[in-house]
Amino acid sequence: MTKNKTMNIKLLSAALGIALSATVMSASAQKAYTAGTVTATTSMRGMDIQMKEYFTLDSMATAFAAGPANIRLLTDANFKSFVVLVDVSAFNVKKAAVYTPDEIDQVLSAYPTFTYAPTTETKQISGFNCKKVVATDSKTKKTYDIWVTNDVTLPASATSKYYAGAGGVPIQYTAFQKGQDGNLVESQFTITSITEDKAPKGTFAIPSDFDKISKDDLEAMSRGGQ
């Protein structure tokens, strides 16, 4: 395996963790749209990443690029299924990692549980009227400033371990991924737009030319083992 391929796979690993965090969060928000697209920005390893989150009443798909890899995360409305699609055309890699229900529960259980304290601070972010809510991690007592809006509502397409009780749709917030040492790594997310644009055809399905693998197989890829 070349050095560049190893670096790209490691970047993919970081991207998957952050994207899963974002999917869990955004799917939890109470939305007034029945279907549409959420665009969000974040950064990882010094690279700016734009994510497209397509949603319906019963499905969510998050799509983004990490180096040469195109990633798509698929989940159902209740977050009872989770699939990671990895397409790296340069290396002829097309994989679909299917998580088991127990594996999904393990991932979700690692995330913080928050209590919330609304503030009187307000500002506009991406055209949304937002108010600041201070979220406190019940375990570590660390606090996070979460900016939420009541300008829009979105369908509850998953049960969130994040900001379901924040009092609005999070627009600027902290997301979490599990690092290689087992500790949570934080990333900042900003939603830049919410539209009624429908997902492209086939967005929520596993393509027929993708090889199905396990979560363990995916983690081996992320460590550069494949």
Model region roles, listed by residue range:
Residues M1-Y33:
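Bacterial Sec-dependent N-terminal signal peptides
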Residues Q30-Q226:
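Extended soluble regions of mature proteins
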